[in-house]
């Protein structure tokens, strides 16, 4: 790795966590990851749930975001799924779950695990953050899908 800082020889000393390091770490963990926008964003699918791995514009905050882009009409589904997201956020610290309406009028649900990397992360911390982002993202999306199934009378796929 050709970087403008010293990379420690141990796994516990923090050092800058940039996009390339995150992608390399995810791949070293045995996961496939496709770069969507060089230096900014990558995508993967874990347990049939799409994820976006990205940094904010300043390169400080790492986001590991799980997505459920349902085909549910936002107008009818949003109250139930907003309440579900609110319940999750009250009971769990991570990830933050929220809903958004697509341009087509369907409802999307997002579970965003954010890590402040300003002071750097050790290799151990980075692996833990990635693992936590993936596992809690999967749990959050599954929670919302199960709740939607009950509240809206959907099948297991989360579709009407």
Question: Which residue ranges define each predicted feature?
Answer:
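Short, highly charged C-terminal tails/helix-capping segments
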Residues: 145-160
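Glycine-rich and polybasic anion-binding loops at the starts of cofactor/ligand-binding domains
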Residues: 111, 139-144, 150
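Short, internal acidic amphipathic alpha-helical interface segments
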Residues: 68-112
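A short acidic/glycine-rich loop-to-helix N-cap element
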Residues: 117-130
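A generic structural signal for beta-strand entry/edge sites
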Residues: 39-41, 59-63, 104-108
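Charge-rich, low-complexity N-terminal segments
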Residues: 1-57
């Amino acid at each position: 790795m050709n970087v403008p800082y010293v990379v420690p020889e141990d796994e516990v000393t923090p050092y800058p966590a940039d996009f390339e390091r995150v992608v390399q770490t995810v791949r070293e963990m045995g996961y496939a990851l496709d770069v969507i926008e060089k230096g900014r964003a990558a995508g993967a699918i874990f347990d049939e749930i799409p994820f976006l791995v990205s940094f904010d514009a300043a390169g400080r905050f790492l986001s590991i975001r799980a997505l459920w882009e349902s085909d549910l009409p936002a107008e009818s589904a949003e109250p139930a799924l907003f309440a579900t997201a609110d319940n999750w956020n009250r009971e769990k610290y991570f990830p933050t779950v929220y809903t958004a309406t697509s341009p087509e009028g369907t409802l999307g649900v997002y579970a965003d695990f954010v890590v402040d990397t300003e002071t750097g992360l050790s290799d151990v911390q980075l692996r833990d953050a990635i693992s936590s982002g993936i596992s809690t993202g999967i749990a959050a999306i599954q929670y919302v899908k199960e709740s939607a199934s009950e509240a809206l009378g959907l099948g297991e796929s989360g579709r009407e």
